[in-house]
Regions:
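Bacterial C-terminal helix-turn-helix
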Residues: 1-4, 15-19, 28, 35, ...
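C-terminal boundary/linker segments immediately following FHA domains
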Residues: 1-11, 20-23, 44, 76, ...
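Forkhead-associated
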Residues: 39-111, 178-180
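AAA+ ATPase active-site-proximal loops
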Residues: 130-258, 262-268, 272, 280, ...
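Intrinsically disordered, low-complexity acidic Ser/Thr-rich regulatory segments
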Residues: 1-63, 136, 146-150
Length: 354
């Protein structure tokens, strides 16, 4: 096997606007919460050995027994952390390719023996938190969360088309993910059924979000996006309400990645955590210092039968503006009439105070 002598480097701004380009702060074991923190300034940055030996700064346990005692070395460079193979028997694999050394970028997979690690920055940790909110925090969801994170990274960097499966309007979910992985300045367009060419042009270097309302239409849009030169091609996100819609597009060029969101009705005790985390994000976006949620609000919100994440966020916005600005000013902030917001809150199935 021919091995590259030069470090494998991925410039997130050369072909993409991958927004998660901050410093690597930890290595996390794939499919788990177990992470190895790395030194950060002002702490001195020194080279760190990875392996099974107790003399390694990052000591790892490989049940498969394929990890060398001194398998790899993390080396601090001006551009960030580099990882070097130390002549290990089973080699160093970064982003799916065997190499002797590579510069670590946020989200990249590192395979050492029978172990897979993920290089994480603070922004990437934030993205993982969002994906856990969408998919679940339970241990049995951890591997699925990591697969989704890789799909999002591939969508941003490689323009791999993505299918989101879930209940309700998924465009707001796609938009939130877009802002995290591509940044707030990158264009995002929710397709409304108008001219496809104009929509693709408007979403260049950003994201084109398309609801799957018919296989033929979605397939034609996917073909049109795929025909665009990759450096300008928008990321394509197709939104489906059921897995069968995604399966019908499985053979299209570019190999679709799929992220399936479980219904909120199946999230059980996690709903309260979703409300807290989503509420904090929404309050910050609206310029509020806190959500203002009362104990009664939280009790009532847990009983709501939300149609999807968009419905949940819409409800949280309404409660936040009422608590922070009051019904009159809050309704105005959302572009609603005072009576509309008040009626919504006092309806029998909500029973929220105003």
């Amino acid at each position: 096997m021919v091995m590259a002598d030069q470090p494998t480097m991925f410039d997130p701004h050369e072909r993409t606007s991958w927004y998660i380009d901050d410093a690597i702060v930890r290595l996390r074991l794939w499919g788990t919460e177990y992470a190895h923190p790395l030194p950060e300034p002002p702490a001195p940055r020194v080279s760190l050995k990875l392996g099974s030996a107790d003399t390694c700064a990052v000591q790892l346990r490989d049940k498969a027994g394929r990890l060398s005692r001194e398998h790899a070395m993390l080396v601090p460079e001006a551009t960030g952390w580099e990882i070097h193979d130390l002549g290990s028997k089973n080699g160093l694999w970064v982003a799916g390719a065997r190499t002797t050394k590579a510069t670590l970028q946020a989200g990249v997979k590192i395979r050492l023996g029978g172990l897979t690690l993920v290089a994480e920055s603070l922004k990437f940790v934030g993205l993982r938190s969002l994906v856990c909110r969408l998919l679940g925090w339970a241990p049995e969801r951890h591997a699925e969360v990591d697969e989704a994170l890789q799909s999002l990274r591939d969508s941003a960097i490689e323009r791999t088309p993505l299918i989101l499966i879930g209940s309700g309007d998924l465009a707001p979910v796609a938009a939130r993910l877009h802002r995290v992985i591509l940044g707030p300045e990158a264009p995002f367009l929710a397709y409304d059924g108008s001219d496809v060419s104009a929509a693709i042009h408007a979403a260049m270097n950003g994201t084109l979000c398309v609801p799957i309302r018919g296989h033929a239409r979605a397939s034609a849009i996917a073909d049109a996006v795929h025909a665009v030169e990759i450096t300008a091609r928008p990321r394509l996100v197709l939104c489906a309400s059921k897995a069968s819609q995604a399966a019908a597009l499985g053979g299209k060029p570019g190999q679709f990645a799929v992220i399936a969101m479980p219904p909120l009705s199946a999230r059980g005790d996690e709903v309260l955590r979703i409300v807290h985390e989503a509420g904090q994000d929404l309050a910050r976006e609206m310029g509020a210092q806190s959500t203002g949620f009362t104990t009664h609000d939280l009790e009532r919100l847990q009983t709501f039968k939300f149609s999807g994440m968009d419905d949940l966020e819409d409800s949280l916005r309404r409660v936040i503006v009422m608590r922070v600005w009051g019904v009159t000013a809050g309704a105005k902030k959302l572009g609603l009439k005072h009576s509309s917001l008040s009626t919504w809150a006092r309806s029998k199935n909500r029973n929220l105070s105003t």
